[in-house]
Amino acid sequence: MMLFRAVRHSDLNGVQSLSQRAGIGLTSFPNNLDQLRSRIARSVDTFDGKLARAQQGFLFVLEDTSANRVAGVSAIEVAVGLEEPFYNFRVQKTIRSSRELGIYKSIEALTLEQDQTGNSELCTLFLDPEYQKGRNGTFLSKARFLFIAAFRDIFSKTIFAEMRGVADEQGNSPFWNSLGQHFFGIPFSQADYLTGIGSKTFIAELMPLHPIYISLLSAEAQKVIGQVHEKTVPARAILEKEGLIYQGHIDIFDGGALLQAEIDRIRAVKESRLVSVSKAESVTRDDGVPCIVANQQFSEFRALLLNVVCDSNELFLTAAEMGALQVSDGDQVRLVSLFPKEN
């Protein structure tokens, strides 16, 4: 059984094992034991109500209960940029013209911005390559939306996801090589790692403050602006189908797309609903469709991916499923179809 749940301190070894396989470019998931321990502690403290809004962040794991193994992670930051600046580039068009020469040029430029300050963030999505099959990745990503829907008041009006940009296995980023390298003088992998472990002051100290004309970058760098790493293409598609869109904001290091949406307009949030559960000795799932089913408990939030009839007002679960969700007869659960309805 694949169970989506809040992270625990005891998950540290499993989470670290995953981080070793994540590779370069997943900034918020560094292979650093102390940082991962702190990240887990921050999530636990957030669930326990010990942190101010600016520090709050939820980390979840996807557990293979049959193997007692952490198969994936995903996270939500409540409000970014309230204590430390959160930077991104915005792609903007500027007009240059000469009446004397009869020349009119529309030129794109990159402007350093802090537009996402105060917004919530979807981040740290990584699934063990051994589990990258079936619907595990989609479940791991979208289960967060049911948590957001259940505890909507915690989060901001807008949410975004900064997608991993284009880089090769050695950590070479065309965008970084053409832009960031000139200002920082360090490899992309080092800048990415420093940001991941919380060393961010160098960004404000060294990043260019004036607009940068995109036409001055290399052809390779221009091609990857607003694009994502080949391994991130499925994750981008998942979010876009839920209503998040690219609006010209990109990652300052690798040029990866930043997707965003108003939370209340996200399909899985607005279509999710509450139903009552009943225990059944056995359940036939043949007439169902893949749905995410989650309990309504804050600190013990749990979700399963089950084939069920989504439009029914009653949901029958086996004893094992009820145990995994920690619900009893008559309790309410929140559910939503895994995929949008086809028009």
UniProtKB/Swiss-Prot annotation:
Gene3D superfamilies, A to Z: 2.40.40.20
GO BP terms in the entry: arginine catabolic process to glutamate; arginine catabolic process to succinate
Single GO MF annotation: arginine N-succinyltransferase activity
Organism from which the protein derives: Photorhabdus laumondii subsp. laumondii (strain DSM 15139 / CIP 105565 / TT01)
Active site: H229
Annotated EC: 2.3.1.109
Name of the protein: Arginine N-succinyltransferase
Function per UniProt: Catalyzes the transfer of succinyl-CoA to arginine to produce N(2)-succinylarginine.
Top-level taxon in the UniProt lineage: Bacteria
Biological or metabolic pathway of the protein: Amino-acid degradation; L-arginine degradation via AST pathway; L-glutamate and succinate from L-arginine: step 1/5
Keyword Oxidoreductase among UniProt keywords: no
List of residues binding succinyl-CoA: L125
Keyword line: Acyltransferase, Arginine metabolism, Transferase
Catalytic activity, as annotated: succinyl-CoA + L-arginine = N(2)-succinyl-L-arginine + CoA + H(+)
Entries under PANTHER family matching the protein: ARGININE N-SUCCINYLTRANSFERASE (PTHR30420:SF1), N-SUCCINYLARGININE DIHYDROLASE (PTHR30420)
Recorded family membership: Belongs to the arginine N-succinyltransferase family.
InterPro entries: Acyl_CoA_acyltransferase, Arg_succinylTrfase_AstA/AruG, Arginine_N-succinylTrfase
